[in-house]
Amino acid sequence: MSLAFDINYRPKAPWFGGDLQTMSAVLSPPKVALDDADIEDLRIPADDGTEDVLLGQRLVRRGSDGPRQETTVVLLHGLLGDFDRDYMRLLTRHYLDHGYIVVRMNLRGAGSSRLLCTRNYHAGFTQDLTVIAQALSAREDTGRLAWIGISLSGNMLLKAASETPFVEAADQAAIVSISAPFDLQATATRFSRRRNFLYSRYLVNKIRKQMPLQPGLRPDQVEHLKRIKTIGEFDEHFTAPDHGYGSADEYYIENSAKRFVLDARLPCLAIVAANDPWIDDRPYRAIEWSKNPLLTPAICRTGGHVGFHAQGHRQPIYTAWSRSFFEASSKPATPTPSRR
C-alpha cells in the first residue's frame, strides 16, 4: 500500500519533547462530548470455559440517516485503561464525525468488565480479539472491521494479524497500532531505567489500586502486590504465572509482536515515536517491513507515548492517519509473506 505519512512533522506547542507529548493528556485533558451518539451496550461472553464477560459500547452518531461508511471502527485501550480514556473518546469523536460506526471495548478484566471477569488481559491475549471479531461480524449492521490498538492492545493486534482464527473472524479487516510495545522485553528494560522512575511508580500504583478489585484474588496475592516495585516484577509474579508462563522473560518472548508481524495477513499501520519514553523504537527499525506489502511503518521523529500532537492539527495525528489508512486499504489479497 503506497501511503506516505509525514513522520518528520513539527510538534505543536507546547508539546516539545517525548515527555511532554506523553503527559499532554494529563497536563491538558481534552474535553470530548459524545452526547450526540446513540449508544448500545455490548456484552460478549468469553469462550474459554470461564463465565467472564467482555463489555463495550457501539456508537452511531444521531441525527443522520445512519452511518455514511460501511465500516465499524473497533477501539482497544492500553495498559490499565478502559474504553472511556481520553484517547478513546478522541478517536470515537473523530470517527463518528466522519460517518463511521464505533465500537469501543474493555479488554478482559478492565474497567467495568473487572467485576465480571476472573482473568485479565495481557499483551498477547489475542483469543479475546477473535471472540470480539466473531460477535461483531455476526451482526448485519457491522460491515467491514477496522481496528485501532493503543499501546498494549496495539501489540495484541499486530500479533493477531498473523493468526488464522482472528484473520478469519475479522475478514478483510485493517489494523492500526499506536505506540505498541513491539518488543516486550525492551519495554520492560526501558521502564527500569532511572529516568522513567516516575512513570514506573505511577503505573505500579495504579496496578496496586486496581488488582485487589479483581474477583478471586487471594489474600496472600494482595499482600504480595504491595511489595511489587516495577512492571517487570508484576509480570514475573502475576502476569506470567496467571497465564501459564514460567517467567516474565518467557511471557515477553512468546507475545512480542515483533516475532509475528512479518507474517501479517491483514493491512497494518504501525505508528510509534522515536522519542517515546516508554517504547524503544529500535526493534521497529530492525524489521524489514518491505518483506510484507501489507505492512506500513510510521516511525515518527516525535510524538512521545500516545501523544502525536503536530503543528496544524487540532487532534493527534493518529486520528487522521488511521482514517486515511483505513480508506486506502480496500480488500487486499492475502499473500503468504516471506519469512525473516
Task: Name each region found by the language model.
Residues 18-65, 309-312:
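N-terminal cap/lid segment of alpha/beta-hydrolase-fold proteins
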Residues 69-78:
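Short beta-strand element of the alpha/beta-hydrolase
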Residues 81-84, 92, 96-116:
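Conserved alpha/beta-hydrolase
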Residues 94, 108-146:
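Catalytic nucleophile-loop/oxyanion-hole region of alpha/beta-hydrolase
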Residues 138-242:
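Alpha/beta-hydrolase-fold enzymes
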Residues 264, 270-272, 276:
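Short beta-strand/loop motif that positions the catalytic acidic residue
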Residues 290-306:
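Catalytic histidine neighborhood in serine/cysteine hydrolases
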Residues 303-316:
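Catalytic histidine-centered segment of alpha/beta-hydrolase-like enzymes
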